Amino acid sequence: MNQYMEFYKLLGEFYNEEDITVDSPMSEHIYFRVGGPADILVTPVNEEQVVNTLKLCREYNVPYFILGNGSNILVKDGGISGVVIKFNKLNKITTEGNCVTAQSGALLKDVSKAALENNLRGFEFACGIPGSIGGAVFMNAGAYDGEMAHVIKSARVIDENCNIKNLTKEELELGYRSSIVMKKGYVVIEATVELESGEYASIKDKIDDLTNRRESKQPLEYPSAGSTFKRPEGYFAGKLIQDSGLKGFSIGGAAVSEKHSGFVINKGGATAKDVLDVIAHVQKTVKENFDVELHTEVRIIGRD
């Protein structure tokens, strides 16, 4: 049992037994399929539970981590201290006029589907991003010349004082893979995107096209966290890595993808250390060859 068992009992006062676990392996919750256990993992089913959990964590000085769909996360082999709050059960999506509103845990593919079903265009870029809308707002996720900054209208967040506030597009300060949510440690609980009216057939065609492009170019057959590195200004990370002769480079069960050099993948049986060692070698080699620093797009968290 871990050091947070007394805190676990406090949380148990407002969680059902199936919504709170101890020493939950993070490899079961993230796309990379690596990582040690979370001391406590909770899956809230309403906003009140989220607020109560955050208040307790802050009152007792217990660290916490917000988890969406786990698609852009690398958890170290030592696991995560404190509490992981997983939003997968907060996934309601509603549509009103040209706006789609989704709870933080709603998957981007499902928001994209809701937009399609209501003949709304502009969210097609997100159809293949394997994340939640909360995570997408957090990092201003994007693909294929689209990003959340292009469509976001507003978001409801929990601030550092556990107060719920509404932030406009401008107040969210969305930049390249960044936001005020990321900078200030806010927690997204709901987001609204504003789209344009379109024709079902043309929207569906674009979704199908982007899906085919993604499947043909990305190593979806292996666990990964998507694009491992941010795009350096004036360059493409994948090309720098490929031109450094690193395609297929591996350590343990982790490797640079043969299909797309911008992806570090879990070929099978990788540890988080394997992945981190591959990332470090890629960064060092690209720096030596091109004097360009590659920064990770994947979030690296946890204990060594």
From Swiss-Prot:
Domain FAD-binding PCMH-type: 33-198
GO terms of molecular function: FAD binding; UDP-N-acetylmuramate dehydrogenase activity
Catalysis performed (reactions): UDP-N-acetyl-alpha-D-muramate + NADP(+) = UDP-N-acetyl-3-O-(1-carboxyvinyl)-alpha-D-glucosamine + NADPH + H(+)
Enzyme class: oxidoreductase
Subcellular location: Cytoplasm
Cofactor dependence: FAD
One Pfam assignment: FAD_binding_4
Presence of the UniProt keyword Oxidoreductase in the record: yes
Swiss-Prot/TrEMBL GO biological process terms: cell division; cell wall organization; peptidoglycan biosynthetic process; regulation of cell shape
Any single Gene Ontology cellular-component annotation: cytosol
Domain of life (superkingdom): Bacteria
HAMAP family the record matches: MurB (MF_00037)
Family: Belongs to the MurB family.
PROSITE patterns in UniProt: FAD_PCMH
Function: Cell wall formation.
Subcellular location, principal: cytoplasm
Keyword line: Cell cycle, Cell division, Cell shape, Cell wall biogenesis/degradation, Cytoplasm, FAD, Flavoprotein, NADP, Oxidoreductase, Peptidoglycan synthesis
Pathway per the UniProt entry: Cell wall biogenesis; peptidoglycan biosynthesis
InterPro entries cross-referenced by the UniProt entry: FAD-bd_PCMH, FAD-bd_PCMH-like_sf, FAD-bd_PCMH_sub1, FAD-bd_PCMH_sub2, MurB, MurB_C, MurB_C_sf, Oxid_FAD_bind_N
The EC number(s) this enzyme carries: 1.3.1.98
NCBIfam families named among the record's database cross-references: murB, PRK13905.1
Active site positions: R177, S227, E297
The protein, known as: UDP-N-acetylenolpyruvoylglucosamine reductase
